[in-house]
Amino acid sequence: MAPLTVDPTALDSAGNQVVTAGEGLGSVISTLSAALAGCAGMAGDDPAGASLGHSYDSSAAKLVEAMVATRNGLCGLGIGVRMSARNYSVAELQSNVGAGGGALPAPALPGPISAGRPPSAVGSSDSAPPGWGWVAPYLGMIWPTGDSAKLRVAATAWSAAGTQFGIGEIVGTGTPMGAIRAQQIPEGPAIDRAFADAYRSTTGVVQQCQQIAAQLTSYAAKIEKVHAAILDLLSRICDPLTGFKEV
């Protein structure tokens, strides 16, 4: 068995850095939520839009839950490391009776955050243009009621959140991981496994954020293409302002 070699102060500092990294992930979630707040109903309520919207709603809610769980887990890991540091400092103080200094204080516990459900993507965001009633019966299609601008805003928000979440976890835990691994303590392997779990969770979050962003961007492009084609057709047969059929 390897001898116990630990610097409680260094271990406590590393744990505090991990907590800070976790809290940073919370800020990423808050920024994402604020951006998505203005994107309600972005997919529309036509059949295609509603189908995509319901799928998005489910995926987005689960992904935010995963992000929150990763944030809370990382903060909890950091507090666990800090508690270990305190325990070692107490043991060190007790084994050196008469030595100066004192034990490290118990760390303050960061409160867990909860997952707020993103606003639904289903809803009417764009009404049909003047003159649509003239051509709709002949085209056999429905005017897409989604809002491509909102879809692109949401896509950008998800993409940015994924990138920032990944960078925040990797950069924020790199240095403290090195400091923790420098300590020869029994719980070292368990802490390593916890960091590996956090990394896997973060990687999954990043990938899913990019997938959602790509899905929203693709649907925005489809809406814009259909809208442009319909508006072009209407401009040929109707007054674009009144929608009255030209004869």
Where are these regions (language model features)?
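N-terminal secretion-targeting helices of virulence/extracellular proteins
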Residues: 1-243
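Flexible nucleotide-interacting loop at or near the entrance of a catalytic core
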Residues: 246
